[in-house]
Amino acid sequence: MTVMLTELNRLVNERRRQKLSQLQNRSESPIQEKEDWLTWELNVERGAPRLDCMAAVVGWREDPDLFHRALSSYSLAKGCVFLLVGVDGDGPEDEEMVNVFNKAYPNHSATIRLDEPLGEVAERTRAKLVAMNQQDDQPINESQIDKMVMQHCVQLAKTILDQHRLAIGGNSRDAIHQLCLQQRHMHKKGIMFTSFVFSLVIADILGVEFLWSSDSDTIVFPDSLSRTIDSIAADANIGGASSGLVVHNAAETVVTRLASTIYWGELYLTRSTTAATATSDCQSGPSSVFRLSALPQILVPWYLQVVMGKRMIINEDRHLTTRLLLKGWGVVYASDVLAATDTPTSMNKWLKQQLRWARATHIESLLMPRVYLKTNPLLFFGMAKREFGPVLAAIAITYYLLTSRSLVPVSLSDIGMRLLVGIFYNIIRNPDRLGTSAWAARKWILPGILFYYIPLPAVHVWSMLTLTADGWGTAMRAEGEKDPVPDSPVVPQFDMGFFIIWMCILAAAAAKWMGCYYSFGLLETAIFMLASSVIVGCTAWRVTVVKT
């Protein structure tokens, strides 16, 4: 079924592109004769949308070389008429990103340092409006208040641009085509909100309909923006889309090689499953497109989301998608379009990234049930499979370890056949060719599958237990992904204890199964289980330590 839905998603996307092509080829002659006026007037409503877009890129203390490569890639991106860069930080260490921006775009560019992040303005304004309504004993209309807050933020952004006397777009000598915004350090959601508000104002000046949103470690290809927009432009009911992703640092370490196969196989198939019905539940942060008309009504509630009494900053991508779906907008996945992102180079960093993504998934999947009442049932099916499968696996393995009985029947031949079908399909149809010659890259596929699925139950369960833990986002290279300091002491990362414990449980359960299969005695089985747990546990500890 997954393969069929993946193919259906590509077919539906291609049909939208064909519809767009038909709209573009339609005659643009306004009036042939007087009696054709009404016909032309109706055709205007169905005319081809403008495909130009602007791009918004956000980051915090990114590696300078990688950031420069990412910014430079937009100079070749088809259809990108304006680039907005958001830097989350205004301290001395944050100036390097601004310098990189100025180096990448020395002409027709400008930098604005904001006195206050617009997210804080929105929060304060909303609290004031709510207090005024309560003081006057008036009912609180949440949507109306959010609308007023959004209008205030947009007006403030307009005022800031006017104060700096920037000539946005155009062909004049002073025209600005790249703008860098710098604000006090908050979190990724904070700089995204500021960038989105300014994007609405700039897009209105330029007359563009679409916004590409990305991260400071993502490199786009010449057709990444244009082909993603092509997949939604002809359908006015679709508010967002995301493209596929490849890993541009796949050859750096063993971890990055393994992670690249996960993007190749897992991402391509799982994201396509629900996207065939325009109900994709997550627009990837590095490669998302939004219809700008969909953003004003969702940005304030998205930014001010509260879960269990706590403001959420970890689930910016998924919650933005959820808000679009709740407002009736479709969200699709352009699986045949690619952009290149960065992946952590160490096991410790990779597990932390997986934890953050898993927490965001749980919040949106389990705590926002209204979305399933307004969307295709396929979205609920995808959620149930994703949320309960790893939990069941963790319970079943632990249950076997404690009782020597199987909780659920497992067919190894069935699992093997599913893996072979998935691998074979990806080799044939996946637009990502893994970057190198066939065998050199594909020999990592099976290890990559194990690399992903072995820790998955532990990541899934632990992220549920630590649901509201915070973090800026995926760790920037400048914050720990650079080479370690020589001769620095090795210290354990105690927040990886969940992974070490899970590997011990898994090793003990596997040893117990082998002992039963080969008819070991009780003492031999116990010794084998203990030895396996110690060896695997020590290995798991070793691969999660870092240099300080």
Spans of model-derived segments:
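Transmembrane alpha-helices and immediately adjacent membrane-cytoplasm interface residues
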Residues: 2-12
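Residue-level recognition of hydrophobic positions within alpha-helical transmembrane segments
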Residues: 3, 262, 287, 312-313, ...
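Membrane-embedded multi-pass helical conduit in multi-pass membrane proteins
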Residues: 4, 385-471, 501-548
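Interhelical loop segments of eukaryotic multi-pass membrane proteins
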Residues: 10-30, 413-421, 470-480, 526
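Non-transmembrane catalytic domains and loops of membrane-associated enzymes and transporters
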Residues: 18-384, 388-389
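Loop-to-transmembrane boundary segments
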Residues: 56, 373-389, 481-505
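Membrane-interface alpha-helices
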Residues: 91, 465-491
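Short, surface-exposed, charge-dense and proline/glycine-enriched linear segments
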Residues: 114-118, 270-278, 363-373, 394-408, ...
